[in-house]
Amino acid sequence: MAAAALAFLAGSAAALYYSHLGLALSHYDARAHLVVSRRIFDSIVPGWQQIGAVWLPLPHLLDMLPVQLDIFYRTGAFAIAISVASMSVAAWAVARLVLRTTGSAAGGLTAAALFVANPNLLYLQSTPMTEPLLFATTMVAVMSVAEWVDGDAPRWPHAQVRSAPRIRP
């Protein structure tokens, strides 16, 4: 948990820094993600078809209600908060995976620190992009599979299979 807290603090500081410099929405795709999220409800033909054909839908589904407010749409603040939280979750999963593999708490914290200290990731998580959420979900999946393989979560695959019919459309 210390890794996640430190990642959240570093990510928040980076997000504030890049926002102050006016770089939070400088990437074209950052603005496009906000537009896709907003047009689900606010467009000439609103609907789920507006989610888009290029990107995976989860980030847009998470942002679709908050971006209806102009402050979140124009600044990307809610989507950036999701990115910062996602990188914190990814750092936690990295630390837990290294701790589980090596037995070293210092190694886990170091791995998370190296992950979070990457300047490219610090900038990326300071924008409303989809990659931080991808990193978080991937790292949690890898960590969960490692726990299952080690025998600490023997029912995990069965629970996933049983819940699958409940989440399909």
Predicted features along the sequence, with ranges:
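Start-transfer (signal-anchor) and selected internal transmembrane alpha helices
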Residues: 1-15, 147
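Helix-to-loop transition at the C-terminal end of transmembrane segments
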Residues: 12-32, 44-45
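Membrane-interface transmembrane helices that cradle and orient dolichyl/undecaprenyl
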Residues: 101-102, 141-159, 167
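Short helix- or helix-capping micro-motifs
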Residues: 7-8, 108-119, 143, 164-168
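Short acidic/glycine- and proline-prone juxtamembrane loop motifs at membrane-interface regions
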Residues: 55, 120, 126-133
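Transmembrane-helix motifs of polytopic, lipid-linked glycan transferases
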Residues: 81-102, 140
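Short hydrophobic/aromatic helix or loop-helix immediately within or flanking a transmembrane segment
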Residues: 35-36, 40, 50-72
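Hydrophobic core segments of transmembrane alpha-helices in multi-pass, intramembrane catalytic enzymes
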Residues: 33, 87-90, 115, 130-142
